[in-house]
Regions:
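Accessory nucleic acid-recognition modules appended to NTPase machines
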Residues: 4-183
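Active-site ExK catalytic segment of metal-dependent nucleases
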Residues: 184-194
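General structural signal for secondary-structure boundaries
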Residues: 129-132, 195-196, 207
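Mixed-charge (Asp/Glu-Lys/Arg
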Residues: 186, 201-207
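Generic domain-boundary/flexible-linker signal
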Residues: 124, 187, 197-198
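Active-site-adjacent loop/helix micro-motif of nuclease/hydrolase catalytic cores
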Residues: 193-202
Length: 207
């Protein structure tokens, strides 16, 4: 059993669990400093540190321009791949079209970045958000981010690669797509009560 889970079961509070998670984050950052080379160390750390804020946006697409002024994707592509290869994050790519096949049908310059361990997202929240979680069990703007991160983590552990779809000329967006046999299955994550409008639109368009 993971130490974080054992700590919560034994004490029934988040306090000890959060301390363990924060130590894991510190260990991850130390690994980046130890194993990443040259300028990539700073860039990788910047990407890692910006994940919570980027997931808190309505549009959860990761924007390199928000990581550093004047930052360009081509300078950060290897940094994102490094984090993915290290097992620290899961990258979800935007499909060009919501249809099969998935390989070759996505834009590698449009993506979301989730933590491979959803608990680390909680541990990296700002102090105000941490206090709201402890006191009121309220995640505020991070609620949708956490729900998506949990689902993305589960899909990866089930053996799926992560893809989403966002139509450029409308608000239509589907959180995840998975392939089973010859079918493309949309997955919509809802952090609150409401209708799955995007999913219904996609399904109706195939009729």
């Amino acid at each position: 059993m993971p130490a974080v889970v054992r700590e919560f079961i034994d004490k029934g509070t988040f306090e000890g669990s959060l301390e363990i998670q924060r130590q894991l984050i510190a260990d991850y950052k130390e690994d980046i400093r130890k194993y990443a080379e040259g300028m990539d160390q700073t860039r990788i750390l910047n990407v890692f540190n910006h994940i919570p804020a980027q997931l808190a946006k309505d549009n959860k697409k990761f924007q390199i321009s928000k990581v550093s002024s004047g930052a360009r994707f081509r300078d950060y592509r290897g940094c994102i791949e490094w984090l993915d290869d290290a097992g620290m994050v899961n990258v979800c790519y935007c499909l060009n079209f919501p249809e099969l096949p998935l390989q070759g049908n996505y834009d590698d310059t449009k993506y979301k970045i989730y933590f491979a361990d959803s608990g680390l997202l909680v541990a990296m929240l700002d102090e105000e958000a941490q206090e709201d979680l402890r006191t009121n069990k309220n995640l505020g703007v991070y609620k949708g981010a956490l729900y998506e991160n949990v689902v993305g983590e589960a899909l990866v552990k089930a053996g799926y690669k992560l893809y989403y779809y966002k139509r450029d000329d409308s608000s239509l967006e589907q959180d995840f797509f998975v392939r089973t046999a010859n079918a493309l299955i949309p997955v919509e994550v809802k952090a609150k009560n409401g209708t799955a409008k995007s999913m219904r639109t996609l399904i109706n368009s195939e009729k």
